[in-house]
Amino acid sequence: MNKSMLIFFTILFLTYIIEEKEALKVEDLPEPESYKRAKQLAVKDAKGDKNAETIALNFLKQNRRDCMKNCKLVPTCALLSPECCPDKTDVCKKLAL
């Protein structure tokens, strides 16, 4: 591989890293009250079982992230991600989805 190709791919890779680092992610947003209530219910339903609690919280987190892209994924998308469902707000449009 010649030097120009190496330089090109290095710059491309660095641009990708910077873009990913600076992009607004779902985890960067404050949690809405409806999502906090859903997390509390998940912990309550686990009845002290830490494994079940972890699975439920991970499930909610993944659904919140996926609902940002597709509001018809589950019926509770409007509760999990009110920034994007049913209407996309400016915050939702800035997310790196």
Curated annotation (Swiss-Prot):
Organism in which the protein naturally occurs: Scolopendra dehaani
Protein name (database record): U-scoloptoxin(10)-Ssd2a
Post-translation changes: Contains 3 disulfide bonds.
Family label: Belongs to the scoloptoxin-10 family.
Tissue specificity of this protein: Expressed by the venom gland.
Residues annotated as signal peptide: 1-23
Location(s), subcellular: Secreted
Keywords, comma-separated and alphabetical: Disulfide bond, Secreted, Signal, Toxin
